[in-house]
Amino acid sequence: YQDYMAVGGDKALDNVVGFSKKVWSSWAPASWELFSKAVPKLNQLDDVGEVEEGTFSVEKVLSLKPDLLVLADWQYEMLGSDLDAINEAGIPIVVLDYNAQTLDKHIKSTEIIGELTSQKDRAAKIAKEYKDIVEHIQTTVKNSKISKTTKSSTWSLVVVAQLNKG
């Protein structure tokens, strides 16, 4: 959600009619509280349920009469035959993939959001900044004299680094 809003800017939600609200509000309550206060429209959008929890409602999506449906790659894969009704209704499906954690897929997903929200320039700027940061980190790590590999993980990020203990 934050990616979509970051690229789309102030008008990111102007054409949004529904989203998986509960997953954001229950899985990341502090983030939800901040965003829903700053962007009150979030509270007005319909909740279409969550794919991973099995609450995603194709009927709810169809009732909203969307021009298109935006899904993460993993959501698209999990929905399987549930997508048939959406396809039969003629609703195009746009698949984004930030979860693959690759530079190319992040940039492509950002560009797609820029296209969807009429924010191509903003998307290009964000993609370039992201690419520059990733390349800077890769160069810094490559050029460092680090000797030991350490792995640390959190719920949304895996960091692999080498620590110089000498």
Language-model regions, residue ranges each:
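A short, structured surface patch at a secondary-structure boundary
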Residues: 1-63, 68, 72-75
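Short glycine-enriched loops at secondary-structure junctions
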Residues: 74-76, 99-100
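Extracytoplasmic substrate-binding proteins
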Residues: 81-164
